[in-house]
Amino acid sequence: MFGADKGTADKLDGKKLHIGIVQARFNENITNTLAAACRAELLRLGVQEKHIRHVLVPGALEVPVALQAMAERDEYDALIALGCIIRGETYHFELVANESGAGVTRLALDYQVPIANAIITTENLEQALARQTEKGVDAARVAVEMANLLEELS
C-alpha cells in the first residue's frame, strides 16, 4: 500500500551483494524513475556499482524470462523486477499483472533467490507517478534485506 507503515528493518548492508535488475521498457517514463531510485538506494546501501547488472526487456510479461536467465547463472544474491502496468479499457491489464506477478513469485521459489517485485500496477498514470520513486527505493531495500536474511538462514 502506498505510504503504508513498512516497519523498520535492521541495518541494511549491501556491501558484499550482487544484484540483478530487470526493467520493463513499457511505460518507460515511469520505469526509468523506478530504476533510478532503485539504483540510487542500492548504492546508498553499499552495493558496488560493478555488482549491479541492469537489463531492459520490452514489457512486464518478459520480465520473468530475463529474471530466470539471471537466476540460472547463480551469480546474484537478489534480483529486482521493475515495471509499470496501468489499467486500460480491456482485460489485458489483469492478464499482464497476474501473469507477470505469478512468474516472478514462481521464480523466487523455484530458484530460492529473493526477487523484489516492483512491477507496479495502478489504475491511472497519476497513481503510477505518485509511486514511482518510493517503489524503486522499496525494491532496493527488500532485495538487500532478503539477500542478507537468506544468507543468514543458510
From Swiss-Prot:
Record-level Gene Ontology MF annotations: 6,7-dimethyl-8-ribityllumazine synthase activity
EC number: 2.5.1.78
Top-level taxon: Bacteria
A Pfam family that the UniProt record links to this protein: DMRL_synthase
Binding site for 5-amino-6-(D-ribitylamino)uracil: 26, 60-62, 84-86, 117
EC main group: transferase
Keyword GTP-binding among UniProt keywords: no
Reaction(s) catalysed (UniProt annotation): (2S)-2-hydroxy-3-oxobutyl phosphate + 5-amino-6-(D-ribitylamino)uracil = 6,7-dimethyl-8-(1-D-ribityl)lumazine + phosphate + 2 H2O + H(+)
Residues where (2S)-2-hydroxy-3-oxobutyl phosphate binds: 89-90, 131
UniProt GO BP: riboflavin biosynthetic process
Keyword Cytoplasm included in the entry's annotation: no
Xref: Gene3D superfamilies: Lumazine/riboflavin synthase
Alphabetical keyword list: Riboflavin biosynthesis, Transferase
Cellular component, GO annotation: cytosol; riboflavin synthase complex
Pathways per UniProt: Cofactor biosynthesis; riboflavin biosynthesis; riboflavin from 2-hydroxy-3-oxobutyl phosphate and 5-amino-6-(D-ribitylamino)uracil: step 1/2
UniProt cross-references to InterPro entries, sorted A to Z: LS, LS/RS, LS/RS_sf
HAMAP family, alphabetized: Lumazine_synth
Family per similarity comment: Belongs to the DMRL synthase family.
PANTHER family: 6,7-DIMETHYL-8-RIBITYLLUMAZINE SYNTHASE (PTHR21058:SF0), 6,7-DIMETHYL-8-RIBITYLLUMAZINE SYNTHASE DMRL SYNTHASE LUMAZINE SYNTHASE (PTHR21058)
Function: Catalyzes the formation of 6,7-dimethyl-8-ribityllumazine by condensation of 5-amino-6-(D-ribitylamino)uracil with 3,4-dihydroxy-2-butanone 4-phosphate. This is the penultimate step in the biosynthesis of riboflavin.
Record-given protein name: 6,7-dimethyl-8-ribityllumazine synthase
Organism field: Acidovorax sp. (strain JS42)
Protein encoded by which gene: ribH
